[in-house]
Amino acid sequence: MRNRDEFAEWAEVHGHLYGTPARALEGALGRGLDVLLDIDTHGARQLRQRYPEAVSVFIMAPSLAELEARLRERNSDAPREIHRRLARAREEIAAWRQYDYLIINRDVKEAVDQLAAIIQAERCRTGRLTLKFPDVEVPE
């Protein structure tokens, strides 16, 4: 699929290949759905190139120390893997200005509320709306 350009984006992350099939993404968008993708900075860059109208949100922990504590708390990664993830996080954090929005995840509920607010605001952008008023001519 990768060689046939069937992915909207793809990346190798922590030794694993991930990708978003373009057909599935475009089908969901064509049905008017909001689509959320959990992708790295390389995938986000690919999406912006292929879909310039895409909205990007960078979500990060309040600090690298907090991220490390969360990774250790999960108790699912070996110390070497945690070290690798922290190094990758440093690289990704450096790219935060390439995104449309930034959420600092201090509290899960607050982060979810902020993401919901972004989605709602984006739905209201005039460039995304098609209005039909029977008594008013609205130029397109």
Predicted features and spans:
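ATP-dependent small-molecule kinase phosphotransfer cores
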Residues: 1-35, 41-45
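Conserved AAA+ ATPase "sensor/coupling" helix adjacent to the nucleotide-binding pocket
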Residues: 4-8, 70-77, 118-121
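Conserved catalytic network of the ASCE P-loop NTPase/AAA+ motor domain
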Residues: 27-30, 48-52, 94-96
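Conserved phosphate-donor/acceptor-positioning beta-strand/loop module used by diverse small-molecule
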Residues: 35-40, 49-74, 105
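Phosphate- and divalent-cation-binding pockets in alpha/beta enzyme and binding domains
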Residues: 46, 66, 110
